[in-house]
Regions:
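Glycine-centered flexibility motif
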Residues: 35-36, 60, 87-90, 107, ...
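Active-site-proximal loop/hinge segments within enzyme catalytic domains
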Residues: 1-78, 147-158
Length: 158
């Protein structure tokens, strides 16, 4: 935590290590509303990591069922005996009271929270077995083309 880090600095128990230039990397900042769209062609593990990265305190990773936008949160990866075909990615194949299971490449994705643009309330109860989450290609392409700039005046995408 932040307090632990400060205590280490204050007690001078912190040793700085010079970083090698060849180890440096830079990744631009992201804007959830632009870059938070799920690519259902990815592996289940990559999708789970992506959903959780855009989860709380953010709105969640974005996708659609038909034309309705949903935000997925609280994802868990399961390796299973079923080897889903790529065409099955995004299909809700099991439902429980407070969660849904989605087919994906290399495993299953369990989601515990789904909200929409109207309400932050959980929408799992309204989702149907066999429904398919899908993200239009135009959203995925737009996410890769825009860079977010965060400043004191707000977030700008160029």
């Amino acid at each position: 935590t932040y307090n632990k880090f400060l205590n280490i600095l204050i007690k001078k128990n912190f040793r700085f290590k010079k970083q090698k230039k060849e180890d440096n990397i830079y990744m631009p900042r992201l804007d959830t509303q632009i870059h938070g769209f799920i690519d259902w062609n990815w592996t289940a593990k990559h999708i789970v990591d992506f959903i959780n990265a855009f989860g709380s305190p953010y709105q969640g990773a974005t996708t659609f069922i038909k034309k309705k936008k949903y935000f997925l949160n609280n994802a868990k990866f399961f390796k299973n005996k079923i080897n889903f075909h790529p065409f099955q990615s995004g299909i809700i194949f099991r439902k429980e009271k407070n969660s849904i299971y989605i087919a994906a490449l290399g495993g299953t994705i369990k989601i515990k929270k789904v909200s929409d643009t109207i309400s932050k309330e959980d929408r799992i109860v309204e989702l149907k077995l066999g429904s398919r989450f899908f993200t239009p290609l135009k959203e995925l392409e737009r996410a890769k083309q825009l860079t977010s700039i965060h400043s004191s005046k707000g977030i700008f995408n160029k």
